[in-house]
Amino acid sequence: MAVAPTSYDILMGTFRSPYLYTLTFDVLARKLQVREVNEATGGHNWLDVSPDGNTLYATVWGEPPKLTSYDIVRGGEYATTKLSRNVASQYMSGYVCSNNKAMYSACGPQVDTFLVDDNGTLLDQPAVQSFNLLQGQEKNKANGTLDFGGLRHGGHSADLSPDGTKLYVADIGRNCVWMYHVDRETGLLTEASKNIATRPHDGPRHAWPHPNGRIVYSLQEHSSYVDAFRLTDDNKLEFLEGGCIIPDEKDHDKYWADEVRLSPMADVVFGSTRGLEEGTPGFVTAWNLRPDGTFASTEATHRFQTKTSGGWANAIAVCPNLGPNGEVFMTLTDSEVGFIQILAYTSDKGFEVVDELKISTEKEHIMPATTVWL
């Protein structure tokens, strides 16, 4: 059983502020603190760490659209970041992931492939592949104004299968999850299938694979469901079952789901949702899983009501190892007020807030977005 170290470095981006935060979480003291505020090229709403752990990739919310790679500098008391390269993007990206050949970007109207060098740095060149996700008259709207609106109504995420041979792209606007085959020698993609969501109003936002490679969890932004799909023939996804993040009595139209992630042992799946307006708290929900990745029950094992709506965030990122008492640690970011929490979860006791840090100041409203654990 994997056991957490005594402390972790965590990197955190924001939606609008040019800062990258280095945080440390002391597992035994159960304490989270800011160690460094690194200079950033803009607001980084999504972060990804290269497979070797030496490069940070980031989306940039700003004009002109671009993507960024940073060197992760280690050797001191805590990790810091150093800019390695900016590259232009046709549209503002919402999500990136990487292997040792390429970085993949979901940016609303399309999915892009950017190549990286042997050190993981983005090459100083445009995307080598772009897959248009728009259909019919939608293509006429695909111009420079499709920034945040494009992300809200288009391709929103990109994640690789555990063996690195497939890329899953959740597309809110097309109500589907696209599958691409990955050439591991070159990093290039080939479109494989378009997998329509179960409900006409689902709006897939993120698609996260189980370590066994056969199950993919699709987070539905509009309906607040976490759905399990099975990879059927290496080309298509088949719906199995789903659980709702919010309680039955809540109005789905007042929420927009944000994130889906697994516990370190892949025996629990977590989903989070935000309130559409201030005064509507969001939820983080957990379901126990069978060893094959299917739901033990689609009824929630535990729910946690968040302190605020979460703003644009209420994003969870799970610690890669269990805590000393078998607990699952995760970060929860809030952009409404501007704080980050560490949550601990066990299937027996549910969720608890371990620590909280206010990031916003009286002089500046800072909007925490997402984190990565190092």
Swiss-Prot record:
It comes from the Eukaryota. GO terms for molecular function: 6-phosphogluconolactonase activity; muconate cycloisomerase activity. It catalyses: (S)-muconolactone = cis,cis-muconate + H(+). GO terms for biological process: beta-ketoadipate pathway. Gene3D superfamilies: YVTN repeat-like/Quinoprotein amine dehydrogenase (2.130.10.10). Keywords: Isomerase. Pathway: Aromatic compound metabolism; beta-ketoadipate pathway; 5-oxo-4,5-dihydro-2-furylacetate from catechol: step 2/3. Its EC number is 5.5.1.1. Pfam families: Lactonase (PF10282). The keyword Flavoprotein does not apply. Homotetramer. Catalyzes a syn cycloisomerization. Belongs to the cycloisomerase 2 family. This is Muconate cycloisomerase 1. The lineage of its organism: Eukaryota, Fungi, Dikarya, Basidiomycota, Agaricomycotina.
